[in-house]
Amino acid sequence: MKKYIVLLLSFFLFSLQLVSQSIDKIVNKNIYISYYSSKLKVPLYVEYDLFRGGGSVSRKNMRFIEEETTAKNKDYAKSGFDRGHLVSAEDFAFDKQLETLTFSYYNVFPQHPKLNRGSWKAWEAKIREESHRYPLKIFVGGIYSTKKIKNKIGVPDYCWKVVINKKTGKLMHVLLFKNDETQAAFRTTLDDLQKKINYKINFKR
């Protein structure tokens, strides 16, 4: 009986996850496309191209833009989570207008501060450096279950990145990050990632 209850609970939680992880809005922000869940008020993933990213534009006076159906600034206040960029602001720091586009809640999910400022940031810098050698197609997203902050905003259990060399089509990185204080990062496969996110992404474009 106990085993049956555990299985039933597991199925219920998995069903909740499937319901949550559904894209109901696709938003084109010029430099990236956000595949957004209005239920979770976060992007499930974004995709963008990057070539020779980086620059010296200051982000000092840039503010996050609140838009229809998105999270608000107050939702993150005292939440214990950073407003983590999926598309790194520094990737487009060669142009102020383009960098400003990354400060949208269509490009933000809650990230543990140690991850956002640690291994996540380090990998952003590494990938940006690689963009000076090859044009890249980049996908960035989260894997969600039931964790929330204020206003029922979904918190990813894991964050992920997929990086493809656009010129050759070669898969360069499939990375999974634990969204906690361990900031653990490890490589995985596209097949394994696809099973975890429960919705289809066409990575080969």
Where are the predicted features?
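Short, His- and charge-rich active-site/binding loops that engage polyanionic ligands
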Residues: 25-82
